[in-house]
């Protein structure tokens, strides 16, 4: 199963490598596409992944909209995207053209359960600031 993993700018290494580890464990080739906004992380991944992993099975691609658009036009077995809703819609539409299954992690939903006896001021601060 060949799949690209499109990662966001805010956690480019962790969110790139987590799915890559799963692909390696399953014996699946994968392409990692870190965000162009996090250029230093993208460059580090570009240097390190081919150095330590089979370059015939695992690759890193860097670039912005033209490179991503091209990659989305290709036939994949599965597409994994982490990022915003606007680009998520573009990824889903591209996947639909080839009836490619995809997983979109679009954030924005952070459910919190607050018990009746919770200190609301403290809970609000922790929810807001992590």
Could you tell me what each predicted segment is?
Residues 1-52, 99:
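Conserved small-residue-rich beta-alpha loop and adjacent elements
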Residues 20, 68-69, 92, 124:
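Generic hydrophobic/aromatic pocket-lining and core-packing "Φ" positions
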Residues 21, 78-82:
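Periplasmic-binding protein-like
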Residues 28, 33-35, 62, 82-83, ...:
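Short beta->alpha connector loops at strand-helix junctions that form conserved
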Residues 43, 69-70, 84-93:
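Active-site core of PLP-dependent enzymes with the aminotransferase class I/II
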Residues 53, 86-130:
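ALDH superfamily catalytic-core signature
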Residues 60-77:
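A structured beta-alpha segment of the ubiquitous adenosine-cofactor-binding alpha/beta core
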């Amino acid at each position: 199963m060949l799949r690209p993993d499109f990662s966001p700018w805010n956690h480019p290494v962790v969110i790139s490598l987590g799915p890559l580890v799963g692909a390696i464990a399953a014996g699946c080739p994968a392409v990692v596409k870190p965000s162009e906004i996090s250029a230093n992380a993208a460059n580090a991944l570009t240097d390190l992944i081919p150095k330590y992993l089979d370059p015939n099975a695992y690759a890193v691609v860097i670039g912005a909209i033209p490179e991503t658009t091209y990659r989305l036009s290709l036939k994949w077995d599965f597409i994994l995207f982490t990022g915003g809703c606007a680009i998520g819609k573009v990824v889903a539409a591209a996947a639909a053209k080839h009836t490619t299954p995809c997983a979109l992690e679009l954030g924005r939903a952070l459910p919190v359960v607050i018990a009746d006896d919770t200190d609301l001021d403290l809970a609000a601060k922790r929810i807001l600031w992590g």
